A protein has these predicted regions:
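Basic, amphipathic alpha-helical patches used to engage nucleic acids or provide basic targeting signals
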Residues: 158-176
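Domain-level recognition of nuclease-like catalytic cores that cleave nucleotide substrates
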Residues: 185-218
Length: 218
């Protein structure tokens, strides 16, 4: 193929190094702005050139090859288990949609903060970190600065006690200004809203924004 876009391959590898996987849908939508025929050529070349290997769970999911993993060294994330990929794909779609609009200056994944407790304390601003969000990101503001946001993907409804613990954790995260919960159902939205409804949450402006995750699950 003429005018081979090395940057497309690089972006795909860098994404997989952080997230532990790459789906065909994410690659087509956010990383390969070409005709459908060219999208498939690039997708297939990721494996043929040795950058990736196909997941045993689906031929529409790729994971980094040993060769690519060696390039990224210790920073590379382990290959994501197939049971978590649907959940993580939703989070990735939100992040990539904002990044493509140049709205995110930086982001951190749960796995990255779990592996680096010092970073977790610094990024979240808590004396204790009993709960790490799925994603934390800095959203660019009109004033030229940024607003730190957290994103939680709720594909299943947890117990009320579990959400109560999550809400209490957020009370202590002084550096998180906006909390976003993407919920799969109205019942999940109701439980999350109730968990953050006490006076302490209102006084500290710890009231989350809720939206339907199915808007991004395509």
């Amino acid at each position: 193929m003429r005018h081979w876009r090395i940057d497309i391959v690089s972006e795909a590898r860098e994404f997989a190094a952080r997230w532990g996987f790459l789906t065909q849908d994410l690659f087509f939508e956010f990383m390969c702005p070409m005709s459908r025929a060219h999208k498939f050529r690039y997708w297939n070349s990721l494996v043929e050139c040795g950058h990736f290997r196909r997941s045993n769970a689906s031929d529409k999911v790729l994971i980094l090859s040993p060769k690519s993993r060696n390039i990224f060294g210790d920073a590379v994330r382990p290959a994501r288990q197939s049971i978590y990929i649907e959940h993580d794909t939703i989070a990735a779609r939100v992040v990539l949609a904002l990044k493509n609009r140049n709205l995110i200056s930086r982001y951190w994944l749960e796995d990255e903060l779990m592996r680096n407790p010092v970073d977790a304390f610094s990024v979240l601003g808590g004396e204790q970190v009993p709960r790490i969000p799925d994603v934390v990101f800095d959203l660019r503001s009109n004033a030229g600065g940024s607003v730190r946001c957290s994103l939680e993907i709720e594909r299943t409804t947890k117990s009320r006690s579990r959400y109560a613990k999550i809400a209490l954790a957020y009370l202590g995260y002084s550096k998180v200004s906006v909390m976003l919960f993407a919920c799969d159902s109205a019942s999940a939205e109701a439980v999350v809203r109730q968990s953050f409804s006490g006076k302490a949450f209102v006084d500290k402006k710890r009231v989350p924004g809720l939206f339907n995750l199915n808007e991004f699950d395509s």
